[in-house]
Amino acid sequence: MPIFYLAGSIKPRCRCRCRYPYPPTPTPAMPPLLLSLRPSPSACLPLRRLLLFRCFATSSATASTSLGPYHASFACRMALAGIHPHHRIAVGVSGGPDSMALCVLATAWKKAAGRKAAADEEGFVSSAFVDGLLGVVVDHGLRPESADEARLVRDRVRGMGVECEIAGCEWPDGRPKQGHVQEAAREVRYQKLLDICIKQQIGILLIAHHSDDQAELFVLRLSRNSGVLGLAGTAFVSQLFAPYVKYDGENFRRYGILLVRPMLDFSKDDMYKICQGSNQSWVEDPTNNSMMYARNRIRASLRNLSTEGTFLSGVHKLISACRLTRTHVDYTWNMIANQSVSILEYGYAVIDLEKLDPLNVDDLCLSQYLAYILQFVSQRHRPLRGRSARLILDYIRTIPCKAALTVAGCYLCAAPRSKGTKVLVCCSVDWMESSSAEISYKCSYEEQAPPVLEIDQIVLEGCLQSNQFIQNRSTLPFVYSKSSIDVLNKAKDLSIIDDSTLEKLCYLRADEHDKFIVNEHKHEEHDLEETKFPDCNVLSLCPGETCHFMSRFLITWKAPEDLNEICLHENKEYLSKICTVNLNGSLEVRHMADADWLFLAEVCNVRSVEENLSDPKASSGKVEMNNAPQHYRYLQWSAHKALQNLRSIPAAARRTLPVLTNAQGDIVCIPSIGFRCCPSLLIQAVFYPRVPLGGGYSSYL
């Protein structure tokens, strides 16, 4: 049975202060109607429905004309993001009305620029597909018909003049873990989209999130007790980084793309209207109707409430106010960080408390400032919440700093000789030991095209826009609101929402919060039943390989071209035993322990090789000398140099440095401080975190 959709008047909202005049929306005599992807109406349909279907043909020209405001608003949002038609762009396409509407607008935007280029350039030749635009359909493989649907969507996107490809998902256990299907599917989907963008040298990915999605996320986070930063919803522009560094032919680099959501000013109804007005078909995902998922339950509740007065418009005003506050917080923490934080080459940060002046920084900005520093140092990208957030705030405001604190994967203490005016932020050894196998990995030398350089220029333009926007704002509504309830009450006091909207939001919050608590207990019980200790995988490194230790240090072992000329004994008859063992095998990577610098001191203090070999109390970490005085003299010189470097590094930071050992546990190399047991070991370590400070660029305009 075909389903008809009614298209009413078009009233897109635009908050980006553009200068595009919106033309008056024509009111057709008969509202245009359009079928979704259902079969065409047949003779067996009632006469009234058949007449309604046929009337679309007579009003399609009017509907097409009425899409002008959408095209203008889309172009304005893209310009606000610093993105121009000449940029190479990918579009995430599911085949639903949202992503198909995005394809319609992106295609028209690109084509308009192409027509202008054709008019300005002699001999311009257009291709079958829109230049610099790629649609990507991710087939999750969770339903039997998903492959057929993916091919159908791909063909429809190509029919619009947009090149499109399908990315299939492979699940280790056949499908995601029960209870986490949506989260797992989302994670895999973005990973597939990211991989294709990197492979195709595309720096921008468009996603079709709209204002109704923002309202759903607002209620969802409200039920989880999120503060104002979480209630700000999804970023307009954000940076997404690959989980692994990649090789560009010369060096290992951090690869990433810009995730742009240009449809946040449009509603779900607008998505249908754009598809209808462009005669574009779509599919409906049946899982969107399942009440198993919180998003779907919230969507249904919002749909029921949206018919009552000004409820939905009040919610959107509240979200806009939260986004304004978030923009201010991001601007403020960046300004403070530039003045008060130093990042050292050994992988730790130093906070200057006198320059920070934490007693005069509001809780919201200071919490975000500290959260970003801790996430950067630990490369543990989880939000700082609850007790941890309160602990770190109290700690940083205690001046002078005298105590130590372990929180969120980091160890904080007073910097030596600073009299408590500076705080060290180092990666926690406990966190490293529990997570080393998860976030340490060998790097692949499969060559990738260089990262897209134009991203830097886009980010620069976006930062200028955001800074100018926030500097022109004198009132910030929720800077001092500490909880979601505080935000709601403040919004009521400021007349952002009325009493009715406040009451309904509190009801939605309580209703979904109760379901969340019940589900959390179920998941906790399930997780306890399924608890298994992770395998204790040891990260090993062979000659010619590179690894990323804790996603923080890039360690590269270059094999020497002519080992025999480098590593011969004084009598030039045979190689040192220690070099032969390690250069023909592999080394294990671990973090530094206190005994390691004691070992370096012992090596420097030993008077002779013979005494070292005959001492039964010698450290187990000592290297066998094998009657190699030349090597031992080099070993002592290297240990002495390493100790000099080590003295400039605080003890807490030393413990996070990478150490390489052989199979017997003997220390072979500590590359960060220049120690190696033999000159033939060409190993170096560079602090190169996977994600930069602040998690990359984001905009909430």
Q: What are the residue ranges of the model-derived segments?
A:
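Residue-level detector of alpha-helical recognition elements and their boundaries
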Residues: 117, 121, 200, 230-233, ...
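Eukaryotic basic, amphipathic alpha-helical target segments in cytosolic regions
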Residues: 161, 306, 377-381
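Inter-helical turn/loop segments and adjacent helix faces that build the functional surface
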Residues: 305-314
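Residue-level detector of well-ordered alpha-helical segments, enriched
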Residues: 214, 314, 365-369
